[in-house]
Design a protein with these regions (language model features):
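Specific alpha-helical transmembrane segments that line the substrate/conduction pathway
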Residues: 51-61, 100-134, 139, 172, ...
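Glycine-/small-residue-enriched transmembrane alpha-helix faces in small-molecule transporters
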Residues: 2-55, 159-185, 206, 313-324
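Transmembrane alpha-helical core positions of polytopic small-molecule transporters
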Residues: 32-33, 88-97, 120, 154, ...
């Protein structure tokens, strides 16, 4: 009877964790999806992409610090974790934001966000190149179809600026794949989410300040007051709300499952762009969205099935070892 009760309790806990993970991931995706609209508005008010990335992290640091202190979270971090957090924060989170914010200058935000969602392709490539993971024929075909989805967005795009926007958008998928993989590979998901987000924001703010000063792209004096308001909202919405809830989503669901529910981000961006800016949705763009997002969803499902199969094989091997 006790074992039955424990089993039921464990099932309920797993079910509750799954619901939490889904909720947190959808909140994160929605917040990320609305961010491009604010970025586009801030750009029109004098903010450069570099300045926005710097400010969004700067503004959220005191908020996160207060939250950590209020919850009595130990802010000490070991040297190895610090190094890994710096690598993931700069080359993952910061690079992704910088590439995306620059891409918004050349392409509609909905297009940029959808192209950015090719990142599962890069996750698979990281597994192939770095970890020598095998890619099945079916998975390889899905990856190819997802990549082909890019061509649907070449409709009516003339000049090098549009092509640059596409390149930046796709590259942002690569850096984001590194961020998602790095959180798990370096076991940073075991660190308190508020604490980790605080360190990521600090590293990002420092690096972006230096980068902006060196490149001369810090536009603080050219920005009107409303641009600062947008930057603050972006900071709270992304570096605090979206990043924090995404980490919780990964914690409760795992990166592969969380990726499915992250699909709410491009949907939010496309619908938001249509409502706010009145950007038309052509049949080619709709088809491109369907091809990329459909392929990514299928890719994620294939990954989940592969993980389940590996877990089953491991359990069977363990059972056989126990008999011996």
């Amino acid at each position: 009877m006790k074992n039955f009760t424990r089993s039921e309790t464990k099932k309920e806990r797993v079910k509750m964790d799954k619901k939490k993970g889904i909720f947190y991931t959808i909140v994160s995706a929605t917040a990320f999806g609305l961010t491009p609209l604010l970025c586009a508005s801030a750009n029109k008010l004098g903010a450069t992409p570099e300045t926005l990335v710097f400010l969004r992290n700067l503004f959220v640091i005191p908020v996160l610090f207060i939250v950590c202190k209020a919850q009595k979270i130990d802010l000490k971090m070991g040297g190895t974790d610090l190094k890994h957090a710096f690598i993931v924060g700069v080359f993952g989170m910061t690079a992704t934001a910088l590439l995306l914010y620059n891409a918004y200058l050349y392409l509609p935000v909905g297009t940029v966000t959808t192209l950015h969602f090719l990142y599962p392709v890069f996750v698979a490539l990281i597994g192939l190149v770095v970890f020598k993971e095998k890619i099945s024929k079916v998975k390889g075909f899905v990856l190819l179809i997802a990549t082909c989805g890019i061509f649907f967005f070449l409709e009516s795009m003339e000049g090098s600026n549009a092509l640059l926007g596409i390149v930046l958008s796709v590259l942002s998928g690569g850096t984001y794949a590194f961020y998602m993989s790095g959180i798990e590979i370096f076991k940073l998901n075991k660190i308190n989410s508020y604490k980790l987000t605080l360190y990521l924001a600090i590293f990002s703010a420092i690096v972006m300040l230096g980068y902006s000063l060196v490149t001369g792209k810090l536009s603080l004096s050219q920005m009107v007051p409303m641009a600062y308001v947008y930057a603050f909202i972006i900071g709270i919405g992304t570096s605090f709300l979206a990043v924090y809830t995404l980490q919780l989503g990964i914690k409760y669901l795992g990166a592969s499952t969380a990726a499915i529910f992250c699909m709410f981000e491009p949907v939010t961006a496309v619908v938001g762009e249509l409502i706010v800016f009145g950007t038309p949705l052509t049949p080619m763009k709709i088809m491109g969205c369907i091809v990329i997002l459909g392929s990514v969803t299928l890719l994620t499902v294939l990954d989940k099935k592969a993980e389940a199969k590996e877990a089953k094989v491991a359990l069977e091997a363990q059972a056989e070892a126990g008999k011996a």
